[in-house]
Amino acid sequence: MSIHIAAQQGEIADKILLPGDPLRAKFIAENFLEDAVCFNEVRNMFGYTGTYKGHRVSVMGTGMGMPSISIYARELIVDYGVKKLIRVGTAGSLNEDVHVRELVLAQAAATNSNIIRNDWPQYDFPQIASFDLLDKAYHIAKDLGMTTHVGNVLSSDVFYSNYFEKNIELGKWGVKAVEMEAAALYYLAAQHHVDALAIMTISDSLVNPEEDTTAEERQNTFTDMMKVGLETLIAEA
């Protein structure tokens, strides 16, 4: 067991999906995995291991924000030996061409957080996805006919930002969306030499406010990113 995860050694697969919402983890386990067994209920951050198309895969919630995903991702990597981690979550569009329910694959993540600068105050350390996972996810999504955007995202420490207009300005520089976890996940992956990718469904738009989704939709639908994430985890080189 680790401090925040109750699993015993061997109960977590070396490939894992990481939704922020623990109820989304439960949904994925119940609807996509066979013979799913719950390995964690600590703080109601549900985690499950089962099989997907014959491959052993885990799924676990991470909560909201970079501090939270940093705790769970680090323990999964260091204490349980996870090698491939794919975040599946929601994001807000910063770009006129990126619409609600479409997918964004984060090739890199800018951030306004100090979580990385605390380690590297003299550098702007780049947070980038595993190219292997990114390449596989892109081709899988396209083959499945899903509208998919690849580009940079903003990982923000603040949901209710006082810099709303500056965030929107990033969209004009090609940043596709804003979310709250990818940069920290990519940083941990670089530190520990594992593979990570963030796949997001656009749940709302900062540039087209009339585009929106409900909390129930965000929890129980958005299945395209789940399919792409699972297919990417089991794809052979």
From Swiss-Prot:
Q: What are the annotated GO cellular component locations?
A: cytosol
Q: Could you tell me what reaction this enzyme catalyses?
A: a purine D-ribonucleoside + phosphate = a purine nucleobase + alpha-D-ribose 1-phosphate; a purine 2'-deoxy-D-ribonucleoside + phosphate = a purine nucleobase + 2-deoxy-alpha-D-ribose 1-phosphate
Q: Where does phosphate bind?
A: G20, R24, R43, R87, V88, G89, T90
| Biological-process GO terms, alphabetical | purine nucleoside catabolic process
Q: Which SUPFAM superfamilies match?
A: Purine and uridine phosphorylases (SSF53167)
Query: Do you know which InterPro entries this protein is assigned to?
Result: DeoD-type, Nucleoside_phosphorylase_CS, Nucleoside_phosphorylase_d, Nucleoside_phosphorylase_sf
Record-annotated active site: D204
Q: List the CDD domains.
A: PNP_EcPNPI-like (cd09006)
How does this polypeptide assemble, per the annotation? Homohexamer; trimer of homodimers.
The text of the family note is: Belongs to the PNP/UDP phosphorylase family.
The protein in question is named: Purine nucleoside phosphorylase DeoD-type
